[in-house]
A protein has these predicted regions:
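Alpha/beta-hydrolase active-site loop
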Residues: 1-22, 183
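Primarily recognizes the serine-hydrolase "nucleophile elbow" in alpha/beta-hydrolase
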Residues: 12-88
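Mobile cap/lid helix-loop segments that gate and shape the active-site cleft of serine hydrolases
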Residues: 47-49, 82-125, 131, 158
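Histidine-bearing beta->alpha loop at or near hydrolase active sites
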Residues: 168-175
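Catalytic active-site module of serine/aspartate enzymes centered on a nucleophile-bearing elbow/loop
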Residues: 180-199
Length: 199
């Protein structure tokens, strides 16, 4: 599956959870999402592209919203058109050439890469409605440069979106004590989903 095929499945999963909120004992208006790397990218995609329910849908699950209310993620790609620096194309080429299949057939030409890269890069869809976002990122990450997180957070600030960047000095694409960051994630979710005081 490529990115454009996966995203609808994430919309569906969130709608399914919201539809079954009572069954699962969750508050449907307080859903958070997390992930790392590609999963972090999908988490941010849902933060900026969550959709309202389709009132006229035959399937009741599709009548639910796919919007989420909070994100905490690790080292996510946020802008495939400006990857490690302005103008660096990584839509299945360059740094991400080994992941070309994830971008599908539209990654074959420079023209299509520009279109696709914009469509799938969360940074272009940040708005004042974007929920709170926390990103943990290693500053020695070569696969997903920290530039990705830094630029995304700048965009969040431009729109007044609550955001926090946790920089792990000297760390690459993952590190040994990530469980400590998961605790920070839990505190972030507690603050923005449960209304508990910030730690």
């Amino acid at each position: 599956f490529n990115i454009t095929e996966i995203v609808p499945d994430i919309h569906r999963a969130i709608r399914f959870i919201r539809y079954n909120a009572a069954k699962y004992g969750v508050r449907p208006g307080k859903l958070g999402i997390t992930g790392g790397s590609a999963g972090g990218h999908l988490s941010l995609t849902m933060a900026v592209k969550g959709e309202p329910g389709k009132a006229d849908a035959k399937d009741p699950v599709d009548r639910e919203s796919s919007a989420i209310q909070c994100v905490a993620c690790f080292f996510p790609p946020t802008d495939f058109l400006n990857y490690g620096q302005p103008g660096e194309d990584a839509v299945g080429v360059g740094t991400l050439k080994d992941f070309k299949v994830a971008f599908g057939p539209r990654a074959e030409t420079a023209e299509e890469r520009q279109k696709l890269g914009r469509e799938i890069s969360p940074i272009y869809f940040v708005s004042s409605n974007t929920p709170p976002i926390l990103i943990a990122h290693g500053d020695a990450d070569k696969l997903v440069p920290i530039y990705q997180a830094e630029q995304f957070m700048k965009r969040c600030q431009e729109f007044g979106v609550e955001n926090k960047l946790v920089v792990r000095e000297g760390q690459k694409h993952g590190w040994a004590d990530m469980v400590k960051d998961e605790e920070i994630f839990a505190d972030w979710f507690d603050q923005y989903l449960r209304g508990l005081p910030a730690k």
